[in-house]
Amino acid sequence: MTEQQPVAVLGGGSFGTAVANLLAENGVPVRQWMRDPAQAEAMRVNRENPRYLKGIRLHDGVEPVNDLLATLQASELIFVALPSSALRSVLAPHAELLRGKGLVSLTKGIEAQSFKLMSQILEEIAPEARIGVLSGPNLAREIAEHALTATVVASEHEDLCQQVQAVLHGRTFRVYASADRFGVELGGALKNVYAIIAGMAVALGMGENTKSMLITRALAEMTRFAVSQGANPMTFLGLAGVGDLIVTCSSPKSRNYQVGYALGQGQSLEEAVNRLGEVAEGVNTLKVLKTKAQQVQVYMPLVAGLHAILFEGRTLNQVIEHLMRAEPKTDVDFISISGFN
């Protein structure tokens, strides 16, 4: 990658904009592509993304654009921050242009029809590209406001990890590397579901003990499912697992937490999502995750409980009561209980 070659960021949302700013602050020329030409022009003129990151100045090194073809042709390193529902339709027509390029997914979601993660879709579209993911406890606004933050870039291609570290690592943003792409990405996608439960618990005035129980049992569920799919359980003790889960389940800045909080205040799911005005991937993930967990026979009572709340008319109190009445099991999976016999 030559010094002046631009890095592409696909997506005009909050996280894509925050990452574009980080790149530009490190002296990297950035082309941020978005589907809406009016949004691109407004950001170019006003140097702000008022819908998704109001009050954050867009760095002069970020060029908002609407020409996807030109953006892909000009860049060898491409960060993909598109909604899970749109990623395939946006990039599949341009598959030939992606050959040999570095594609890094920023999207924490799962494709509904196939239960594929975003990097798996990228791999299908561009099998000869180098694929990676970026995930961790990364609230977009805090990144944009230069709060001290760490993240994980994961790929089977060590050179891609090093390339991402070189362009993103900075004074307030630390980038760690991992070879467990599947585990890192799955952690980022699964925790969105549990953030909805956490937001509901806070809105309903539940105690700190209850919230702590929900978060730790969520981690156990996430890990149990991920290991059944081939992920490394140790990945879930890092930034992309427990780190991301804690911040998403604890912060009112989290979109999925906000949806849960609105539900806890008595709003319908439709009202909560409409009020948010952005994609809350957890709602989409919940539907496909419940089905997949049943197919592979992985015990996920919180997922089943949240599905019952959102789509079957149950309340959070009923779900927690059911959880408390369930048969007690071991605290931490993957630790032998032979000593109990």
UniProtKB/Swiss-Prot annotation:
Keywords: Cytoplasm, Lipid biosynthesis, Lipid metabolism, NAD, NADP, Nucleotide-binding, Oxidoreductase, Phospholipid biosynthesis, Phospholipid metabolism
UniProt GO MF annotations: glycerol-3-phosphate dehydrogenase [NAD(P)+] activity; NAD binding
Residues bound to NADPH: S14, F15, R35, K108, A140, R255, V279, E281
Cysteine disulfide partners in this protein: none
Active-site residues from the entry: K191 (proton acceptor)
One Pfam entry name: NAD_Gly3P_dh_C
Catalysed reaction equations from the record: sn-glycerol 3-phosphate + NAD(+) = dihydroxyacetone phosphate + NADH + H(+); sn-glycerol 3-phosphate + NADP(+) = dihydroxyacetone phosphate + NADPH + H(+)
EC number: 1.1.1.94
Coiled-coil intervals, chain numbering: none
Domain of life: Bacteria
Top enzyme category: oxidoreductase
GO BP, sorted A to Z: carbohydrate metabolic process; glycerol-3-phosphate biosynthetic process; glycerol-3-phosphate catabolic process; glycerophospholipid biosynthetic process
Function, in words: Catalyzes the reduction of the glycolytic intermediate dihydroxyacetone phosphate (DHAP) to sn-glycerol 3-phosphate (G3P), the key precursor for phospholipid synthesis.
HAMAP family referenced in this protein's UniProt entry, alphabetically: NAD_Glyc3P_dehydrog (MF_00394)
UniProt name for this protein: Glycerol-3-phosphate dehydrogenase [NAD(P)+]
Origin species: Pseudomonas putida (strain ATCC 47054 / DSM 6125 / CFBP 8728 / NCIMB 11950 / KT2440)
